[in-house]
Design a protein with these regions (language model features):
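Alpha-helical transmembrane segments and their immediate juxtamembrane cytosolic regions
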Residues: 1-226
Length: 226
């Protein structure tokens, strides 16, 4: 029996397509509603006093919602198969660490980070970064023992580390663990803490709601002066 939530799949697909679109469109020649509301064209300088919201502001929250809404399907299915909470937490932490590495790795290999203006070397390194991601995150569709698949992944991570440590960057920049893609880093946090919240409140919706209300109170109250 197919228990997929097609509406959730559709929302996730829409969010991915529009995230790619919003990151690649030439916003300098398009109207303001094609950019973030607080970073209007042509300069795209952040101005928090500007009111409003555009579709560009909504696509990433849509993806986060779809990701969180999928937890009962992915985690719940594994729990029904008998996986312990410890194993579920391990998988969540592993996924979060992988996403964190991904966020750091790709941020260091944007062409504009490698050289200014961009040259052939920068684009070739960016393409190499893209190529290394495949053995890092996909399972090679060949019949091999598990140790071979693991070895390929470890080798890919090793190549990525060597690339980050030995590459020279534009404007005197050097490798830094704090230089990362904030969007992917948010997904990594969601993968760890969102999964952990669901795992420990899987059978108690009221406890989950209480934790969410507590988080909401902390977020809303952080800017209140004493």
């Amino acid at each position: 029996m197919n228990n997929r939530a097609y509406a959730l799949d559709a929302l996730r697909g829409y969010a991915i397509i529009t995230m790619v679109l919003s990151a690649t469109i030439v916003t300098q020649v398009l109207p303001g509603w094609m950019s973030h509301a607080q970073t209007p064209p042509p300069d795209h300088i952040f101005n928090p006093s500007l009111p409003g919201i555009t579709w560009v502001d909504l696509v990433f929250p849509f993806f986060l919602f779809a990701m969180g809404a999928a937890f009962p399907f992915s985690i719940g299915k594994r729990a029904e198969k008998g996986d312990s909470k410890l194993k579920l937490i391990y998988e969540a932490v592993k996924r979060g660490v992988q996403l964190t590495f991904f966020a750091i790795f790709i941020q260091h290999f944007y062409p504009y980070v490698l050289s200014s203006p961009q040259d052939i070397r920068a684009w070739l390194l960016a393409i190499l970064c893209f190529a290394v991601l495949f053995p890092m995150f996909m399972r090679i569709p060949l019949k091999m023992p598990d140790w071979a698949h693991t070895g390929i992944k470890i080798a890919a991570y090793g190549i990525a580390v060597i690339m980050m440590l030995t590459t020279s960057y534009a404007d005197g920049r050097t490798f830094s663990l704090y230089f990362s893609n904030v969007i992917i880093l948010l997904l990594a946090n969601m993968a760890i803490f969102g999964s952990a919240l669901y795992i420990f409140t899987m059978h108690n919706r009221w406890l989950r709601l209480g934790v969410l209300l507590l988080l909401m109170a902390v977020i809303l109250g952080r800017g209140v002066s004493h």
